């Protein structure tokens, strides 16, 4: 009787639906399928737009339970690129990113809110210029699935804004230039 019960349980478990769990992904920066760009109003007349060329990170994601998502990103702030060498030197200096002292910025998620239809708010802590503050990213799950090379990918976009002074950047460029807008594109490859 015990053998029959054991066999029945094993057989049933083979045909039971598998529990879906979060998958771990590495952000695909090598294939240039991810970007961190920024925009700052320039004295109320136009915008300075740039990007960070060197960053890495990972995330876990389960479409059935997006609130369990975890995100970790590290940015090499020395890699800032606004397409103007002299300006980039200034941005790396003590007035802005102070990369001689703080060559890395990090973001670590603390919670995720599911707003429906793939819209998420990813709450976390941003450490920039030696200061750590809470930051919310308005994100959207673009899609996920098999890629042509046998891997599995998931992609997201995100936007956030923060005040420079909150991260110890004290230079006064006027009220229209006090905030940084970040645009994020993230494609992860399942580990």
Swiss-Prot record:
Signal peptide: 1-22
InterPro entries xrefs: Lipid/polyisoprenoid-bd_YceI, TTHA0802/YceI-like_sf, UPF0312/YceI
Residues annotated as transmembrane: none
GO CC field: extracellular space; periplasmic space
Keyword Signal: yes
SUPFAM superfamilies per record: YceI-like (SSF101874)
Coiled coil location: none
Similarity comment: family membership: Belongs to the UPF0312 family. Type 1 subfamily.
Keyword field: Periplasm, Signal
Organism: Shewanella oneidensis (strain ATCC 700550 / JCM 31522 / CIP 106686 / LMG 19005 / NCIMB 14063 / MR-1)
Name of the protein this chain belongs to: UPF0312 protein SO_3370
Subcellular location: Periplasm
Highest taxon in the source lineage: Bacteria
Stored HAMAP family: UPF0312 (MF_00780)
